[in-house]
Amino acid sequence: MLLHQTADAIIRARENELRKIGISRMKAVVLFIVKAISGPATPAEIARWLFREPHTVSGILDRMERQGLIRKAKDLERKNMIRVVLTEKGEEAYHRSSEIKAIRNILSCLSQGEQDNLRAYLETLRKKALKELRVERSLPFP
């Protein structure tokens, strides 16, 4: 329960911060993933990173495309594949959303050593949870 309440409170603070720049948390996460993926970002790859079904991600990407944050481009080498590319507006939104002031402010109650330990503990827990889910890939952390 403590983990759930803490995560919810931090997420809500982050959503409030993102609302001020006109972007949802999920859209900010998608922008981060597109930037973090080495190689072309595809809807299927984004879905894997988000632990979402492809049709759910497709809806998010459609809304982001209508907002001008991303562009879906056909892959020139593989005609049946779509690549997701950030537009200039998407790049700007990515940079504005990557400031994460709310989370930094929340973490400021911990010393640098405590923050380092927390990060290490969270990475250990994430690794174990991914193993439990039989997911064999590393996920980035900003």
Predicted regions and their residues:
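Short alpha-helical "packing" element that flanks the helix-turn-helix/winged-helix DNA-binding module
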Residues: 30-31
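A short acidic, leucine-rich amphipathic alpha-helix
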Residues: 45-47
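N-terminal leader segment of winged-helix/HTH proteins
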Residues: 1-21
